Design a protein with these regions (language model features):
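N-terminal leader/linker segments that initiate helical-solenoid repeat arrays
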Residues: 29-112, 123, 132
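Solenoid-like repeat scaffolds
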Residues: 65-68, 102-107, 135-142, 169-177, ...
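Generic helix N-cap/helix-start motif at coil->alpha-helix transitions
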Residues: 70-77, 108-114, 140-148, 175-183, ...
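Residue-level recognition of tetratricopeptide repeat
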Residues: 79, 83-86, 119, 153, ...
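Residue-level detector of the short coil/turn that links helix A to helix B
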Residues: 92, 125, 159, 192, ...
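Alpha-helical adaptor scaffolds
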Residues: 115, 119, 216-217, 291, ...
Length: 382
């Protein structure tokens, strides 16, 4: 089985990093371009991003004849569509994937088919349905590490530390490795000694320098997440290194751009997001940077984003409450509306970035956030 990970459960730009463990996602020797003296990003020709994801996904669907469709072929096609959604940032291939599932009776579904449907639900923020499918996977294959890792990712994005700990324990069963180290130290970083947890993961990365390349890649992204949350100065370098390892990964690009915004480096955000205006999350971050810089092209991009958000709501595809709240707060300067969007986002997503957004929107709106701010170590939720 191909082992893959969906980092952080359901962030709109690709519910995170969908890394295929055992397959090399990085582009070795990718051409890079320097931005000023500090920022390095892949050159445009190092990134391959589909401009017509729906057409490609439709072709993939048409290539599967209903008669004689096997569970293995179905799982392979579903994985291709999920990857297409990840690469483009669009949910539309996921709708085609859902249609493919109807072409094989559920009585013939394998653990891998259930796993792919769980991933589809996860990307669409249908976390309860994803969990139900993961139950099916683990009933058929109790040791399926991909299912446990997906469960861990969903638990984190929902702020359910108890469930995340249980999933992480199963990832450690009988197998050491950087993925197990990553989840263990990431969870420890929410406790009383977060800096120690960060150092432990850093040491594990040093020890595992020659281990599975993609597991190492996963650990590096986790390290960057932890450094950002702990406000460590090396966070930017870690995001930069992570992005250079996989230039096509939209999640890393967005997290790096957001880190740059937090450092008041708006000009560099324009370079990191250049050419990715079709991806809502990156377009919003670009619009924030343009707003701060009073860029002459800001009104055009803002108008496009307003149209996209309106169309997405009309189509029933609105998955980007976090992005919409950021847009309202940092571009439109409408704290009250941003607070409503941040609260809607908090209903399903309770990762640290979601908490930070809700607290900031509430503060600027002069309203209580409604978040438990006890901050007790050993807590069961974020």
């Amino acid at each position: 089985m191909v082992f893959s990970t969906s980092r952080k459960g359901g962030r709109g730009v690709c519910p995170g990093t969908f890394v295929i463990l055992g397959m090399l996602c990085a582009l070795p020797g990718a051409v890079v371009a320097s931005i000023g003296t500090a920022v390095v990003v892949p050159a445009a020709d190092a990134v391959v991003l589909s401009r017509d994801d729906t057409a490609m996904a439709t072709a993939a669907s048409a290539a599967l004849p209903a008669p004689g469709l096997s569970p293995d072929r179905l799982a392979q096609a579903l994985r291709a569509l999920v990857e297409q959604s990840r690469a483009s940032g669009s949910p539309r291939p996921l709708g085609l994937a859902a249609g493919l599932l109807d072409r094989l009776p559920a009585s013939q579904w394998t653990a891998e088919v259930y796993l792919m449907r769980a991933t589809i639900h996860q990307r669409l923020h249908r976390f309860d349905l994803a969990e139900a499918d993961l139950d099916q996977v683990l009933e058929l294959a109790p040791g399926n590490r991909q299912a446990w890792l997906t469960r861990y990712s969903i638990a984190l994005v929902r702020g359910d530390l108890d469930s995340a700990r249980r999933a992480c324990e199963r990832l450690q069963d009988g197998r050491a490795g950087l993925v197990a180290d990553s989840c263990r130290q990431e969870l420890a970083s929410f406790g009383e000694e977060p800096e120690q947890a960060y150092e432990q993961l850093t040491q594990a990365l040093v020890r595992g320098d020659n281990l599975n390349t993609t597991e190492r890649d996963y650990a590096l992204v986790t390290q960057a997440e932890m450094a950002t949350r702990l406000q460590l100065p090396e966070a930017g370098d870690l995001w930069q290194r992570s992005l250079l390892r996989d230039p096509a990964d939209l999640y890393r690009r967005a997290r790096y751009a957001d880190w740059l915004l937090a450092q008041e480096r708006a000009q560099e955000v324009l370079l990191v997001t250049q050419g990715f205006e079709a991806v809502d999350t990156l377009a919003v971050l670009r619009a924030i940077a343009m707003t701060r810089l009073q860029h002459p092209q800001q009104p055009r991009l803002v108008g496009e984003l307003e149209e996209r958000f309106a169309e997405a709501r009309w189509r029933g595809e609105f998955l980007h409450e976090w992005e919409y709240a950021r847009f309202l707060l940092d571009v439109k300067n409408d704290a009250q509306a941003a607070l409503a969007a941040a609260q809607a986002n908090w209903e399903t997503q309770r990762a640290p970035v979601d908490r930070l957004l809700l607290r900031r929107a509430a503060m600027l709106a002069g309203q209580p956030s409604g978040i438990d701010e006890s901050g007790q170590a050993g807590r069961s939720t974020l």
